[in-house]
């Protein structure tokens, strides 16, 4: 490369300087202040880890989307594509015998290959918080309430937090005869709101009609608390009903704090990360096509109850 070319950054990364850098620092500081007020303690994990921390069995990003390399012992290492699995590993190591609630927060870069995605970055800054050893709906509600406060602290006035539950889809899928590969295809159709493809896929499958009807309607199961009431009347699946009752409790918690205007329920919400086992949420605001916040409960990643 010539000297002039060395002034540029590789594709997918960028320099942040001047006013933009100052704004980012101010926003990060404000969010960190809210997290500290909620009792969260700082934690730092390595920028790269062993590949197995993020492999497919643990429900993170696809192997092809990771930046991988080898150490001198021929171990496969990756630049972290997500910080949550790193936190889970750290907690399993240092807090294995801890039974009391644990609250941890962090800031760091994540790295994902995004070939084919125009305008998206491979390196992004991730700010997050993890609450361990608390399986209650109160914990779910508190994390979402803190998310709303963090967004308000960032200066956002118009935003919505969409809330769903992983067990609604999983409960309905239990009643089907779909194979794992077919389930992944169905999830893609649902994420793309492709109702016609969903109908075509399920047309001649062996499953209860109520289950088929709800799966087809999933992309439209979006709205206020009345959406939960509607779906409860349409299914007898115990796993899905338990998830819906959980969402009702979360609504009551948030409504008691006057935060109900900031939330909607998306009962067809499916997460990119497979490790989520319970409540899932994403926050959106005007001018961005993607979620500005993603989160949820994962009780299997480190054998602890976490949101």
Range-by-range predicted roles:
Residues 1-85, 141, 162:
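TRNA-binding/sensing appendages of the translation machinery
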Residues 154, 167-169, 182:
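Extended alpha-helical scaffolds
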Residues 41-43, 159, 181, 262:
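A local structural micro-motif
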């Amino acid at each position: 490369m010539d000297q002039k070319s060395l002034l540029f950054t590789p594709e997918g990364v960028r320099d942040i300087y001047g006013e933009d850098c100052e704004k980012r620092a101010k926003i990060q500081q404000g969010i960190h202040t809210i997290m500290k007020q909620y009792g969260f303690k700082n934690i730092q994990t390595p920028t790269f880890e062993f590949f197995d921390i993020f492999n497919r069995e643990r429900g993170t990003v696809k192997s092809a989307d990771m930046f991988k390399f080898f150490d001198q012992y021929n171990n496969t290492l990756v630049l972290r594509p997500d910080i949550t699995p790193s936190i889970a590993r750290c907690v399993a190591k240092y807090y294995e015998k801890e039974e009391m609630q644990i609250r941890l927060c962090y800031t760091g870069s994540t790295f994902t290959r995004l070939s084919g995605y125009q305008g998206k970055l491979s390196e992004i800054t991730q700010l997050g918080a993890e609450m361990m050893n608390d399986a209650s709906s109160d914990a779910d509600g508190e994390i979402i309430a803190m998310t709303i406060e963090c967004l308000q602290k960032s200066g956002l006035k118009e935003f919505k937090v969409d809330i769903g539950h992983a067990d609604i889809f999983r409960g309905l899928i239990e009643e089907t005869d779909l194979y794992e590969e077919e389930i992944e295809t169905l999830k893609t159709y649902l994420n793309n709101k492709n109702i016609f493809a969903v109908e075509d896929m399920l047309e001649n499958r062996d499953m209860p009609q109520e289950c088929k009807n709800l799966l087809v309607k999933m992309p439209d199961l979006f709205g206020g608390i009345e959406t939960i009431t509607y779906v409860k009347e349409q299914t007898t699946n115990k796993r899905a009903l338990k998830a819906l009752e959980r969402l009702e409790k979360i609504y009551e918690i948030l409504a008691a704090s006057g935060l109900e205007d900031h939330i909607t329920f998306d009962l067809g919400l499916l997460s990119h990360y497979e490790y989520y086992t319970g409540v899932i949420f994403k926050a959106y605001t005007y001018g961005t096509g993607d979620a500005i916040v993603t989160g949820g409960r994962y009780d299997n990643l480190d054998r602890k109850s976490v949101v």
